[in-house]
Amino acid sequence: MKYAASGLLSVALNSLLLLGSNQRFATQDVAPVWRGIAFGQSTDVNFATNVLPEKVGVNDVTINGKKLTVNDKADLSAPITIESRGGKIANTHDGLTFFYTQLPANVNFTLQSDVTVEQFGPESDAKPNAQEGAGLLVRDILGVPRQEPLKEGYEEFPAASNMVMNAIMTQDKKSKTEVKMQLISRNGVTQPWGNTNAEITRTSYQEKINLEQTPTFRLKLERTNDGFITAYAPKGSDQWVSKTVKGADLVTHQDKDHYYVGFFASRNAKITISNASLTTSPANTKPSAPFKAETTAPLLQVASSSLSTSDTYPVQARVNYNGTVEVFQNGKSLGKPQRVRAGDDFSLTTRLTQQKSDFKLVYIPSEGEDKTAKETSFSVEKITLADARNLYVSPEGKAGNDGSKNAPLDIKTAINALPGGGTLWLMDGDYSATVIPVSATQRKGMKTLMPVGKKAVFHGLQLNASYWKVKGIEITEKSFRIEGSHNQIERLLAHHCDNTGIQVSSSDNVGRPLWASHNLILNSESHSNQHPSKKDADGFAVKMRVGEGNVIRGAFSHDNVDDGFDLFNKIEDGPNGAVMIENSISLNNTSNGFKLGGEGQPVAHQVKNSIAIGNHMDGFSDNFNPGALQVSNNIALDNVRFNFIFRPSPYYGYEKQGIFKNNVSLRTQPGKYDDAVVGRLDASNYFIRIIERSTVRVRKSRRRITNPSRCQRSSAGMKKAACNWVIFCRRSNRHKTQRHRNRYPSTPA
């Protein structure tokens, strides 16, 4: 074909312009436009966890000293600096700062550059926690740009996508200067806010990169017809180390016509991109097999003890799918298979006719994808003890003793030997980290663990069993974790643990029917817990796969390095069961007082008659839970950021959100933020609006408020005198000072 002179000139000029830049395009006449954006959870300008005060809100793309807005256009001709002091790389969603361009679905690409890691991990003395990262990224959709300036009381919700990352990640959470390269891919996302059953894979392919010695290296991300390639090479070298993942159409699920590729940083990282180039070519994408979410495998949990002091023995088990269970004793069937429902306790009573008996359980699921038989075997030994229903235990106890006060058992033997309705008496002393295995005895009453003296201290305790009462013990160094159900925890003190003090959670492989449910934590205290990352060490937590009916009542959480009470919920798990917190206090924790959810999952938690004082972030927070929360008769005093923050749902109107009654917000000194509450409110609530910016009349009557003294403790850890916070707040409630109802305009009174 012949071209007119003007056409030839145009082609020549365009070619020169393209050759003069670092971008080459085989399928497009016009070079893509590059832009900067920050989006997703924890990218808002108020996010401050492990962030230096002067860096709060920094999630910026900078070129030649200019910070890009979402409307600015750029290219790859100059170095690009990306700094993120918020966001996270989560299993089902991301919060990050992204320098990107949009490409059509019918092209492949190769993106590569030199990357200099200016800083990685928190700039404070905290350690990395594997939610920070930086590198190259391709994803099928963008999140909504974060609000700038931020509307008070609003924070960014999760932004989910299918994606592939060539990611710089912490090597081991111990060092800020040693990182590794990972290929991270996510598939199965069908909604922009995330969904259950999405899948993430993380594959390390270059380990132990020392940033002090080699802060600059080369990275590459490539889309081919059948997948993606991530690669790393030393600076100035073509000695690439690479990793491949199948599925080139992974990034065209939510948007069939386009995808987005570029450079990112998340949580706590700063990188500079230089010598960047993007090359595209026509794609002949090979269709992938439809994504199929991995289902929970059938699980048979033996809930019977390995020791028995009686000839009568209950064979017990739990399963996570409906089915049948058949029991064999010493090779002989004890009857035809019995039906069992997922989550229910299976029990069959037999007699032990010899000193040692062998059992086999055969479980055949009647639902789910895998209906093949599952077998498990165990043995039971008969033993003789002084009084099986009252077993004494000592740190120096021995398995061969009779369990009397003068001949105490060791803790492991006593746990296995204790029958339903019995009590395990703990002598004073320090007990090493202990596991109470799965058990389900209930017909003869609950089992009890309690001290006979004044100070029984466990250096970690894992309660996998159900129907236990745990009273009056102390936990330190390692957490008290509860994975069983129908347990009662009373008058327990947890302190100086390296993670959350007292936590109800479930393993990720058991399935919803076996999630921890109907546990009661009563009149307990948790304080001074601290994880090495300076995060994640809550006082109390009921989070990460919990069922219905868990209750915290009369708890005191203070001076923990994260939240006082944490009900966090991951998208990939689906909504947790509703939790009730009542008559509890959260004081001086480094994050929130009461964190009532997470990641946009709607759950109708309840918090009643509780107090949040001096927490370093928010007093009462929905933490992105848009569900029908019930928040009543609570007091928030002098929390650093918001006393109350309950955000507008991005999914539906206020009428489906929380119910708020008789809540009171107080400050002894002016705060920075108004309370921000969206939901169903009435005139019984008193929330703060800063007077200088308010046109609403404030009550004229005033009364001076004096903070009470801190609780004092003896060397034994017990309170010398009762705390007077509750009395203080009750008095303050009678003299509501500089308070009034505050609501979003769309929320009715």
UniProtKB/Swiss-Prot annotation:
**GO cellular component term, pick one:** extracellular region
Keywords recorded for this protein, A-Z: Calcium, Lyase, Metal-binding, Secreted, Signal
State the SUPFAM superfamilies in the record: Pectin lyase-like (SSF51126)
Instruction: Provide the pH dependence.
Output: Optimum pH is 7.5-8.0.
- Keyword GTP-binding in the entry? The reply is no
In the UniProt entry, which residues are flagged as the active site?
Answer: 595
InterPro entries, A to Z: Pectin_lyas_fold, Pectin_lyase_fold/virulence, Polysaccharide_Lyase_9
How far does the signal peptide extend, from start to end residue? 1-26
A GO MF label: pectate disaccharide-lyase activity
Report the top EC class in one word: lyase
Which superkingdom heads the taxonomic lineage of this protein's source? Bacteria
Which amino acids does the record list as binding Ca(2+)? 538, 562-563, 566
Q: Does the keyword Oxidoreductase apply?
A: no
Task: Tell me where in or outside the cell this protein is found.
Answer: Secreted
* Activity-regulation annotation: Activity on pectate is nearly completely inhibited by ethyleneglycol-bis-(P-aminoethyl ether) N,N'-tetraacetic acid (EGTA), EDTA or nitrilotriacetic acid. Activity is specifically restored by the addition of Ca(2+).
* Cofactor(s) required for function per UniProt: Ca(2+)
Q: What is its EC number?
A: 4.2.2.9
Q: Which chemical reaction does it catalyze?
A: [(1->4)-alpha-D-galacturonosyl](n) = 4-(4-deoxy-alpha-D-galact-4-enuronosyl)-D-galacturonate + [(1->4)-alpha-D-galacturonosyl](n-2)
Describe the outcome of a gene knockout: Mutant exhibits reduced growth on pectate, but retains pathogenicity on chrysanthemum.
What's the family? Answer: Belongs to the polysaccharide lyase 9 family.
Job of this protein: Exo-cleaving lyase that catalyzes the digestion of pectate. Contributes to pectate catabolism but not to bacterial virulence. In vitro can also use citrus pectin and highly methyl-esterified Link pectin as substrates.
User: What's the protein here called?
Assistant: Pectate disaccharide-lyase
Protein source organism: Dickeya chrysanthemi (Pectobacterium chrysanthemi)
